[in-house]
Amino acid sequence: MERMARVTTALTGRTMFCHLDAPANAISVCRDAAQVVVAGRNIFKIYSMEEDHFVEKLNLRVGRKPSLNFSCADVVWHQMDDNLLATAATNGVVVTWNLGKPSRNKQDQLFTEHKRTVNKVCFHPTEVYMLLSGSQDGYMKCFDLRKKDSVSTFSGQSESVRDVQFSIRDYFTFAATFENGNVQLWDIRRPDRCERMFTAHNGPVFCCDWHPEDRGWLATGGRDKMVKVWDMNTNRAKEIYCVQTIASVARVKWRPERKYHIGTCSMMVDHNIYVWDVRRPFIPFATFEEHKDVTTGIIWRHMHDPSFLLSGSKDSTLYQHIFRDARRPIDRANPEGLCYGLFGDLAFAAKESLISSSSSHDSNRKPYDRRHPIFFLRRPDPTEQFENISSGLSVFEAGGGDMGWFVATAERYALAGRPLAELCDHNANVARDLNRWQVAQTWTMLRIIYCSPGTVPPANPNHSLGKSGTSLPLLNSFNLKELPSGIVGESRLEHSKGDSRADSILMDPAAINNDENEETEGSDVPADYLLGDVEGDEDELYMMDQEQPHTEEQEYVLPQEGFPLRHEIMDNPSALDHLQEKADSPHVSGNEAETVSLTPVESFSLISISHALYENRLPSDFFSPTVRDMLCFYAEQGDVQMAASVLIVLGDRIRKEIDEQTQEHWFTSYIDLLQRFKLWNVSNQVIKLSTCSSINCLNQASTTLHVNCSNCKRPMSNKGWICDRCRQCASMCAVCHHVVKGLFVWCQGCCHGGHLQHIMNWMQNNCYCPAGCGHVCEYS
């Protein structure tokens, strides 16, 4: 065909694009880099690349009836025959196309052996008639285009095949990537089993590409947002480079003539194309930002020209990118870096000029030594390498930045296994020993808030008052005449509006003998309700009017001392005179003077009674918002240890006040710090005691135990403790002849052993091996 003529001149052009009729799924170029084929669900066309634009040359979707054979998931152009194309159809058919046919329909052969969608097709780089395909059904098939059926079928014994690529240097080798994260290497001469298999990614591996120069380098990309470069020349696949991206990696392509450059595009979210230098994986070397939707296919225009990149996208555009027009993120990046060390050290890296200028203002700091530069770089072509930035590194040791307190606190804290009061007291003592006074005070306040004082037994069952030994008779005897004269006194509670509350339980004898005084003036509560029945329980005397709401809020005059002092009970005539003066005061009504206040006076104090006369405690739920704010304060200050520890100790008392996401963030941060300091036991304890379900499962999902048969050394299956290969039980106890599933102890001389306790009991009475081998064993 005239339109398929080869172009032998040097490639020229500029950044250009053309609109397609439909979104593209894959693109491929011919050997001479003059034409490109675009394939998709509703498009299958060939374009020629002119100096400054694309020209449509051929539409391969012909026929009146639409066919799924034209719905392509992948397309490849043979690099040895310009007239040969292959497509992977979404209905599981592999189709070859012969552009040399004189008819309008260029379809050549159909291979219908796959049962599900074919994800990838690949021609052998040197064998004209060899075609390889990978499908969702988990099989890979090798076709000879001179035959109607496949010549080899490869079963990965795994999930869907995502990509297949022939090695450029090894004639018989190809690589396949799978949905479960594995990569397999196959020899086309041995379809029964793969040559090598290893887990490359955490999740599906969507793509792979062999290095065009180094025969042992294989690049892979997956859903875990990573691009990894593997060295396959060693006995085991070795990861030599890793690039972290911001989205799932859909395509990877090594850049020609640049050993360390690789191009990538994402499957979702990110529409840009990135070119990475795998030696500098933290920032892209170049980016192309022209596409407005997901990029589905990328390919370098010529295998020996690194300047032209072609791409197709779901935005129905086909682009040719010129490398000189690419954006360089390094030009807009901040060349300063800041990082905290594990033990509180602060490292700061900046431009050498910045450090040199700042050092002139700080004569005490040692200037940066130019004899030991951070980066030793050659003088490369500035358009093909990262900018050479000479940086200086300074390390600061901040005062008080030592993290020894964190380790000591984590190791000594008690989080469970004791009553709440003991946990709070223990943790307060730990914080106090480490001179963390605010933390110690916080634990003490938590004990006061959430632990009832009623659990503490009284020092004297007779409720002794003070140190003089004068005891207060039980109030249910109702003989107020026997009370000491220092107690039966006169006081008052000053009210803002003159109405008194029924808070008095001790009254003047004259008032008691007055039968006409049936109610306390200014109160709606009967006096006999306050005092209770003569034969009633003692606690009934302490009841307050908590059920009947008051119409007006009471206002009281607060005492001058917030915490009343405890006084001894003694006869003090001056106290009687003092009380009498208060009773004669014109500001006090008669009945108010007869009431006895709970506020302590100079001569005595009812606070000395071990049991409160009435319940003056607020419920612990009242303080929950305050405790929540306190935990948020510690978290904002960076002390997630305190926030996570209080969450564990208080449990359901405070968990409902804090949203699940915040709790998970605190626990995750604390566990990360513990693991950085290698406090594995404390970390596991926090995971087990965590109140978040997502945290509890951390040590269950990340722990894998591999067991090998002690006889044939082969890995054990998940079916039990019997080896499938040699049909013997693993790790039998020489004493009880059962499988040892826990600690196993054995003799280093004869290699027999068993359960730890069984061997200990056996060796107490015997010196020979319990297996009967005759060896003299010793337990130490």
From Swiss-Prot:
Gene Ontology terms for molecular function: ubiquitin protein ligase activity; zinc ion binding
Start and end residues, zinc fingers (C4-type): 708-730
Subcellular location: Lysosome membrane
Highest taxon of source: Eukaryota
Residues noted as binding Zn(2+) 4 in the record, renumbered to the chain: 752, 769, 773
SUPFAM superfamilies on file: WD40 repeat-like (SSF50978)
InterPro entries the UniProt entry points to: WD40/YVTN_repeat-like_dom_sf (IPR015943), WD40_repeat_CS (IPR019775), WD40_repeat_dom_sf (IPR036322), WD40_rpt (IPR001680), WDR24 (IPR037590)
Repeat (WD) residue spans along the chain: 67-107, 113-153, 156-196, 200-240, 244-286, 290-333
Family note: Belongs to the WD repeat WDR24 family.
The protein, known as: GATOR2 complex protein WDR24
Gene symbol of the encoding locus: wdr24
